Amino acid sequence: MTTRRTFLTMSAAALAMPALPRIAAAQKYPTRQIRAMVPFAAGSSLDIVGRIVMDPLSRQLGQTIVIENRGGAGGTIGTASVVKAEPDGHTLLIQASAHSAAPAAYPKLSYDPVRDFSAVIPFGTIPNVTVVHPGRGFKTVQDLVAAAKKSGKFTYASAGVGSATHWAAERLRLAGGYDAVHVPFKGGPEALTEVMAGRVDFTCMGMSSALPLIRDGKLVALAVSSAA
């Protein structure tokens, strides 16, 4: 039995994956259906990537993995529910950089992001993309920054306070030196919907959830947070 909850985190490496069969055999794991918690809304970048990874993992382990979405409070609500589960490896948490940043946004967390979890499968990175409504007429980030400075009333959407999308947009705001009001939602899909509707000026969202909307011409991409 593990002494800490199992934690699936988004990172740049996947070296822990090959060790899974040996670990499972040694501990006779799993013995029943596995629950994988995604602490953000269905359709969010983390949800999309999590489902892609859980499918082959389920086949490899020979056990069903049921994904549960419980968004809100920058991922801390769903994460807190995992802490309360039996620490036997049958409840997994699929998280991202928001996990380590949570204490900065929520000083009174009911759990410790480090001590209460064991990171077992780092499996990828999701670059953020800055997107706006096509009607804005922006072609570059410089266009957005110039308009924001001139307006003084810009808004940006995120998947919640303390989410990776929140920090990405806030970093862009600080680097650009303009003021903008943060409008948090329970998940990325809601944030993208508001930008598409023109009710919020921009968002820095995970590429996996924003890309289909960019390809359909519903959003315009201004910048990507990677070299790709």
Give the ranges of each region predicted by the language model:
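N-terminal twin-arginine translocation
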Residues: M1-T9, A14-Y29
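Short, well-ordered beta-strand elements
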Residues: R32-A41, V66, T91, K153-A157
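Extracytoplasmic "Venus flytrap"
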Residues: A36-V49, G72-A73, S158-A164
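Short, polar/charged alpha-helical segment
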Residues: L46-G62, H166-R173
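Short helix-initiation/N-cap motifs at beta->coil->alpha
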Residues: R70-G78, I126, V183-T193, G206-S209
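Hinge/capping helix and adjacent helix->loop/strand transition within the periplasmic-binding protein
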Residues: K84-H90, A104-E190
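Alpha-to-beta junction loops
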Residues: A85-L93, G152-F154, M196-M205, K218-V220
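C-terminal lobe and pocket-closing loops
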Residues: T125, A210-A228
